[in-house]
């Protein structure tokens, strides 16, 4: 008889526990490790941290803050890469005793923040605007000593070397040669001479072509 009463007492205790839970609601159960079980008729409210979070990856700013240092709307600096070139100065059979070093300006301009040894920085206002080319900016004069073969006396010569480079803005109009008229009528007439009419010369050329076989 004692064995049959034990399961009955266990069932009564479980039933009493469920009745107490239904009277108090599901919020009485709380999982301290991960989450809180909400009520059956109530929806969980999103935490305020997610609503006020400004560092989320959004489509309108590409996952970056609104004021990003590399924003395309900001003014960025463009400059040339500094390339040193060493060569000897020659004048016929004579050659300089020591090589000279100068800068070589070639290639396109790049962002100054990506070029640690950049020179000749300029402001670039539009990212999709005109193209920039690296060209010589300033020159310096240097006198070198030339040594000639055959026991001739050494002589000196003054050479011109590139001292700095700069970025020159080239627009699309520079490459549109079809828009420019290179005809003879656009040339300026020389002083002291009257411009020759073009129609007369055209008739003379036409007569020569007719007589040619």
Curated annotation (Swiss-Prot):
<feature type="compositionally biased region" description="Basic residues">
    <location>
        <begin position="190"/>
        <end position="201"/>
    </location>
</feature>
<feature type="glycosylation site" description="N-linked (GlcNAc...) asparagine">
    <location>
        <position position="175"/>
    </location>
</feature>
<feature type="glycosylation site" description="N-linked (GlcNAc...) asparagine">
    <location>
        <position position="53"/>
    </location>
</feature>
<comment type="subunit">
    <text>Interacts with LRP4 (via the extracellular domain); the interaction facilitates the inhibition of Wnt signaling. Interacts with LRP5 (via the first two YWTD-EGF repeat domains); the interaction inhibits Wnt-mediated signaling. Interacts with LRP6.</text>
</comment>
<keyword id="KW-0358">Heparin-binding</keyword>
<protein>
    <recommendedName>
        <fullName>Sclerostin</fullName>
    </recommendedName>
</protein>
<dbReference type="GO" id="GO:0030509">
    <property type="term" value="P:BMP signaling pathway"/>
</dbReference>
<comment type="similarity">
    <text>Belongs to the sclerostin family.</text>
</comment>
<feature type="disulfide bond">
    <location>
        <begin position="105"/>
        <end position="165"/>
    </location>
</feature>
<dbReference type="GO" id="GO:0005615">
    <property type="term" value="C:extracellular space"/>
</dbReference>
<dbReference type="InterPro" id="IPR029034">
    <property type="entry name" value="Cystine-knot_cytokine"/>
</dbReference>
<dbReference type="Pfam" id="PF05463">
    <property type="entry name" value="Sclerostin"/>
</dbReference>
<feature type="region of interest" description="Disordered">
    <location>
        <begin position="178"/>
        <end position="213"/>
    </location>
</feature>
<dbReference type="GO" id="GO:0140678">
    <property type="term" value="F:molecular function inhibitor activity"/>
</dbReference>
<comment type="function">
    <text>Negative regulator of bone growth that acts through inhibition of Wnt signaling and bone formation.</text>
</comment>
<dbReference type="GO" id="GO:0140297">
    <property type="term" value="F:DNA-binding transcription factor binding"/>
</dbReference>
<dbReference type="GO" id="GO:0071374">
    <property type="term" value="P:cellular response to parathyroid hormone stimulus"/>
</dbReference>
<dbReference type="GO" id="GO:0036122">
    <property type="term" value="F:BMP binding"/>
</dbReference>
<dbReference type="GO" id="GO:0008201">
    <property type="term" value="F:heparin binding"/>
</dbReference>
<feature type="domain" description="CTCK">
    <location>
        <begin position="82"/>
        <end position="172"/>
    </location>
</feature>
<keyword id="KW-1015">Disulfide bond</keyword>
<feature type="disulfide bond">
    <location>
        <begin position="80"/>
        <end position="134"/>
    </location>
</feature>
<dbReference type="GO" id="GO:0060070">
    <property type="term" value="P:canonical Wnt signaling pathway"/>
</dbReference>
<feature type="disulfide bond">
    <location>
        <begin position="109"/>
        <end position="167"/>
    </location>
</feature>
<dbReference type="GO" id="GO:0090090">
    <property type="term" value="P:negative regulation of canonical Wnt signaling pathway"/>
</dbReference>
<dbReference type="GO" id="GO:0030279">
    <property type="term" value="P:negative regulation of ossification"/>
</dbReference>
<dbReference type="GO" id="GO:0005794">
    <property type="term" value="C:Golgi apparatus"/>
</dbReference>
<dbReference type="GO" id="GO:0030246">
    <property type="term" value="F:carbohydrate binding"/>
</dbReference>
<dbReference type="GO" id="GO:0032991">
    <property type="term" value="C:protein-containing complex"/>
</dbReference>
<feature type="signal peptide">
    <location>
        <begin position="1"/>
        <end position="28"/>
    </location>
</feature>
<dbReference type="GO" id="GO:0030178">
    <property type="term" value="P:negative regulation of Wnt signaling pathway"/>
</dbReference>
<dbReference type="GO" id="GO:0001503">
    <property type="term" value="P:ossification"/>
</dbReference>
<feature type="disulfide bond">
    <location>
        <begin position="94"/>
        <end position="148"/>
    </location>
</feature>
<keyword id="KW-0325">Glycoprotein</keyword>
<dbReference type="GO" id="GO:0030514">
    <property type="term" value="P:negative regulation of BMP signaling pathway"/>
</dbReference>
<keyword id="KW-0964">Secreted</keyword>
<keyword id="KW-0732">Signal</keyword>
<dbReference type="GO" id="GO:0045893">
    <property type="term" value="P:positive regulation of DNA-templated transcription"/>
</dbReference>
<keyword id="KW-0879">Wnt signaling pathway</keyword>
<dbReference type="InterPro" id="IPR008835">
    <property type="entry name" value="Sclerostin/SOSTDC1"/>
</dbReference>
<dbReference type="GO" id="GO:0009612">
    <property type="term" value="P:response to mechanical stimulus"/>
</dbReference>
<dbReference type="GO" id="GO:0031333">
    <property type="term" value="P:negative regulation of protein-containing complex assembly"/>
</dbReference>
């Amino acid at each position: 008889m004692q064995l049959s009463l034990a399961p009955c007492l266990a069932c009564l205790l479980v039933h009493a526990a469920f009745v107490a839970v239904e009277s108090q609601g599901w919020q009485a159960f709380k999982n301290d490790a991960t989450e809180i079980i909400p009520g059956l008729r109530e929806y969980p409210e999103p935490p305020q941290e997610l609503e006020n979070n400004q560092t989320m990856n959004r489509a309108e700013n590409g996952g970056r803050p609104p004021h990003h240092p590399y924003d395309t709307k900001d003014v960025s600096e463009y400059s040339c890469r500094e390339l040193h070139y060493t060569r000897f100065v020659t004048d016929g059979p004579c050659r300089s005793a020591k090589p000279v070093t100068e800068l070589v300006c070639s290639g396109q301009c790049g962002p100054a923040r990506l070029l640690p040894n950049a020179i000749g920085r300029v402001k670039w206002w539009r990212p999709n605007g005109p193209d920039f080319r690296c060209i010589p900016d300033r020159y310096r004069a240097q006198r070198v000593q030339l040594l000639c073969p055959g026991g001739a006396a050494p002589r000196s010569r003054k050479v011109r070397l590139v001292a700095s480079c700069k970025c020159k803005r080239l627009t699309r109009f520079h490459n549109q040669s079809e828009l420019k008229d290179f005809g003879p009528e656009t040339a300026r007439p020389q002083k002291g001479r009257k411009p020759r009419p073009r129609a007369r010369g055209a008739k003379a050329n036409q007569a020569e072509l007719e007589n040619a076989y």
